[in-house]
Amino acid sequence: YADGQTAGRPALKAPVTQEAAFTRTGERNRVTGKETFTAWTPATKELAQEATPVVTGFVADKANVAAKTVTPDDKDSEETVKYSKLGSYVPNVPDGLPKVPNLPYPNDPTDPTKPGTDLPVIPHVPGTTPVGPDGTTPLTPKDPSDPSKGYNPPPIPSDPTQDTPI
């Protein structure tokens, strides 16, 4: 996780290790001490692309670790995928009225780098009309003839790790 915290969060996929094996033979001239080697076999090796899994409630910084061609002269390398917590719609209900819990943004089921489009319904609190993050624009009811069915949320911000006040 990008913030280093793991307690109370979904378990992440175990690290994936890909190895490339190269071989060659060598000889040492017993008179001169000179060593000679054959060419490496294979000369290059392709490491496979690794898809980043979706982790509920989080977005990843990359959709996959790209395939990579390595040679015997390459140093060991490591790729890290960082997950950041998705933001939420944060209802600000006036004192004395029933509180509404934060509504986390959904995950995209196929792209770990984006929030989903299956947005939650903002619950209706009698006596109030929820407004968007600008603090003045009312949210539109799911059913204009029956606001008790809740409201359509505003769009998720371009940085999906940021909360949206309602």
Model segments located where?
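Extracellular modular ligand-binding repeats in secreted and cell-surface proteins
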Residues: 1-166
